[in-house]
Swiss-Prot record:
Enzyme Commission (EC) number: 4.1.3.39
Family, per entry: Belongs to the 4-hydroxy-2-oxovalerate aldolase family.
Residues at the active site: H21
Keyword match Manganese: yes
Catalytic activity: (S)-4-hydroxy-2-oxopentanoate = acetaldehyde + pyruvate
Molecular function in Gene Ontology: 2-isopropylmalate synthase activity; 4-hydroxy-2-oxovalerate aldolase activity; manganese ion binding
UniProt-annotated binding residues for substrate: R17, D18, S171, H198, Y289
Pyruvate carboxyltransferase domain ranges (all copies): 9-259
Name listed for the protein in its UniProt record: 4-hydroxy-2-oxovalerate aldolase
Keywords: Aromatic hydrocarbons catabolism, Lyase, Manganese, Metal-binding
CDD domains membership: DRE_TIM_HOA (cd07943)
Matches recorded under PROSITE patterns: PYR_CT (PS50991)
């Protein structure tokens, strides 16, 4: 698992959480079991399972789940012989009640996610997760939208609450490699805990960004097999593993088996092939939260406007995750302007 004397790099596979956005939160228990079993057999370290917006996300605003996420988490735990199940929790969407439920049925890791400038809202959840005996990471979302200094300040807060790692989370897929480098380096120099990176492929640099993060000392990284994640997906896990192997990193994950998981297990589940289309490209370009894509496309159809215009305007307004209601407001405003022209 180690390269020379470096700390081990650990991967969290997010296709069953981030990929829930692509699936419109309609994963079945059988699908979760099938994917989890295959990932576990391949040697994956962590497998994240929950609604796309984390615990408690099954709402009208974020999208209703077909199956209660606790049943999906329980099914995933049941299929694992060596991998550990992770969950995402966004304070204000998920609660400590749901976190306790997830822990009780076997989830071992929680990533507590906040907007990059709002780490203070994570204190209660991080501390409670530690009391539950869970492994706890902080997840600073929309990391492109804050200065490096602000990112470090917020990372230090999460560290002080008890987080065992802090992630630079490129929710919009907007960061370029040099921007990842300066952020990871600054956190590595300022914090005494592990640093992680979560990328999105909206500008086709998710794998490059992840490699850059590792080169700067990140030891926790995310991938989504077959790029099954919001927007254009995340760093494609099987590709990432191949690159890391070429670079000399040995992660004890079977590359051939991960290729097979991508081709034979996950690909048939995809509603459409994961590729960088104009909507996801605009999200990376404008710096918009990746899970906004489907909401923007639906709003564009409803109000007869261009989804790209909606996303660009959301980027200008610096709308963040949790403000999905703004998408309809922007679409309505654009439609009104269109009628007046």
């Amino acid at each position: 698992m180690r390269r020379n004397s470096e700390r081990p790099v650990r991967i969290t596979e997010v296709c069953l959480r981030d990929g829930s956005h692509v699936m419109k939160h309609q994963f079945t228990e059988e699908q979760v079991r099938f994917v989890t079993r295959a990932l576990d057999e391949a040697g994956m370290h962590y497998i994240e399972v929950s609604h796309g917006d984390g615990l408690g996300g099954s709402t009208l605003q974020y999208g209703k789940s077909l199956v209660n996420e606790m049943k999906l988490i329980e099914a995933a735990v049941d299929e694992c012989k060596q991998a550990q199940i992770a969950v995402l929790l966004i304070p204000g969407i998920g609660t400590i009640h749901e976190l306790k439920q997830a822990a009780n049925i076997g989830a071992k890791l929680v990533r507590v996610a906040t907007h990059v400038t709002e780490a203070d809202v994570s204190a209660q959840h991080i501390q409670f997760a530690r009391e539950l005996g869970m492994e706890v990471c902080g997840f600073l979302m929309m990391a492109h939208s804050a200065s490096v200094e602000k990112l470090v300040e917020q990372g230090k807060l999460m560290e002080s609450y008890g987080a065992e790692a802090v992630y630079v989370t490129d929710s919009a897929g907007a960061l370029l490699p040099h921007e990842v480098r300066e952020r990871i380096r600054a956190l590595r120099q300022s914090l005494n805990i592990e640093i992680g990176f979560h990328g999105h492929n909206n500008l086709s640099v998710a794998v490059a960004n992840t490699i850059t993060a590792i080169e700067e000392g990140a030891t926790r990284i995310d991938g989504s097999v077959r790029c099954l994640g919001a927007g254009a997906g995340n760093a494609q896990t099987e590709v990432l593993l191949a690159v890391l192997d070429r670079m000399g990193y040995k992660l004890d994950i079977d590359l051939y088996k991960m290729m097979d998981v991508a081709e034979e297990v996950v690909a048939p589940l995809l509603p459409v092939p994961q590729e960088i289309q104009k909507g996801s490209l605009v999200m990376g370009y404008a710096g918009v939260y990746s899970s906004f894509l489907l909401h923007a496309e639906r709003a564009a159809q409803r109000f007869n406007v261009d989804a790209r215009d909606i996303l660009i305007e959301l980027g200008k307004r610096k709308v963040v995750g949790g403000q999905e209601d703004m998408i309809l407001d922007v679409a309505a405003e654009l439609a009104k302007i269109k009628m007046e022209v």
